[in-house]
């Protein structure tokens, strides 16, 4: 019995020494990280991923199109539905956990989209000669980055009554792909950086 076990063990070891090679298969629809920014297909996938993030229910898939923003604009009358998720928002109760959670989701998901834009700009530039329609994709990403920052500025920035209000801290306009904490820019700086991104997009 021991002899049979030894023979089977040796046979298994010699037959399957490199099973990692044939078990390590990339699933269809996925691209290796190192290939993402070096090919047209990869760059198209990255830009598609930015749109996917923006269309999540936390952003334009609901909250920013017909959800919380419409409730705050009083397009929906929820005053008779106190158990609705947005009821406390209609009462301008910004301490409610549902309202706080919704705003936090907008903040984090929008900055996730901005990070995706910054990653595209940072990683794809060395391979731009290999990527079809690179300038078009790059312009699209700069435009999306400006859009995302302007949406955050509109929601979380100070109310602008006079030009002096543009000197107040608003949001962090992130243009670098890193995890370094960044202080808030003034409204004036945010508007200038957004204009710069839109000019690059052209």
What would you call each of these model-derived segments?
Residues 44, 84-156, 185-188:
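Conserved, well-structured interaction surfaces
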Residues 55-61, 75-79, 148-159:
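Secretory-pathway/luminal and periplasmic proteins that interact with or process carbohydrate-rich
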């Amino acid at each position: 019995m021991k002899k049979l076990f030894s023979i089977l063990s040796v046979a298994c070891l010699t037959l399957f020494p490199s099973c990692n090679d044939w078990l390590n298969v990339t699933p269809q629809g996925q691209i290796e990280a190192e290939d993402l920014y070096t090919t047209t297909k990869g760059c198209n996938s990255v830009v598609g991923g930015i749109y996917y993030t923006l269309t999540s229910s936390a952003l334009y898939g609901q909250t920013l199109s017909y959800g919380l923003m419409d409730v705050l604009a009083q397009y929906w009358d929820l005053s008779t539905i106190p158990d609705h998720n947005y009821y406390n928002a209609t009462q301008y109760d910004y301490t409610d956990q549902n309202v706080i959670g919704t705003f936090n989701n907008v903040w984090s998901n929008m900055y996730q989209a901005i990070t995706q834009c910054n990653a595209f700009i940072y990683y794809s530039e060395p391979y731009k000669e290999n990527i079809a329609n690179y300038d078009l994709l790059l312009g699209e990403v700069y435009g999306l980055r400006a859009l995302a920052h302007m949406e955050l500025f509109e929601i979380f920035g100070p109310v602008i009554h006079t030009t002096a209000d543009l000197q107040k801290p608003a949001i962090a306009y992130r243009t670098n792909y890193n995890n370094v904490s960044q202080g808030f820019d003034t409204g004036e700086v945010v508007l200038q950086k957004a204009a710069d991104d839109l000019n690059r997009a052209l």
